[in-house]
């Protein structure tokens, strides 16, 4: 399993979306998220977007007022994860006008289409958007 978790955090440090692919006890998640978020938000824009945390890496990218944070195994390719984040952001931009907070179920669904059990399974923006549009058109 390469990806351990995927977090979407605002610039105030509040978690807006979290998806875990590794079993982390629910009671430990807030403290862990808080520490990781602090590490990422305290870094300057000229610093590297990769941070070592315990026995894995944290890869993050800032878009507007949101931080996309992904925890991965130490063997995972950092650039591939940055590309995954960028692809996810492009798909979210295609699906939502500005605010995704009113459609978190759809944001989770899109992420589930891209990542399954910690592995990247789909990166085609076109395929994901076709499936999302088909599913949500039926509602």
UniProtKB/Swiss-Prot annotation:
Protein name, per record: AP-4 complex subunit sigma
Gene Ontology cellular component annotations, sorted alphabetically: Golgi apparatus; intracellular membrane-bounded organelle; membrane
Subunit structure: May be part of the adaptor protein complex 4 (AP-4), a heterotetramer composed of two large adaptins (epsilon-type subunitand beta-type subunit), a medium adaptin (mu-type subunit) and a small adaptin (sigma-type).
UniProtKB keywords: Golgi apparatus, Membrane, Protein transport, Transport
Cross-referenced SUPFAM superfamilies: SNARE-like
Membrane topology: Peripheral membrane protein
Superkingdom of source: Eukaryota
Biological-process GO terms, alphabetical: protein transport; vesicle-mediated transport
Encoding gene, per UniProt annotation: ap4s1
Family affiliation: Belongs to the adaptor complexes small subunit family.
Summary of the function given for this chain in its UniProt record: Probable component of an adaptor protein complex. Adaptor protein complexes are vesicle coat components involved both in vesicle formation and cargo selection. They control the vesicular transport of proteins in different trafficking pathways.
Protein's cellular compartments: Golgi apparatus, trans-Golgi network membrane
Main location: Golgi
Disulfide bond annotation, renumbered to this chain: none
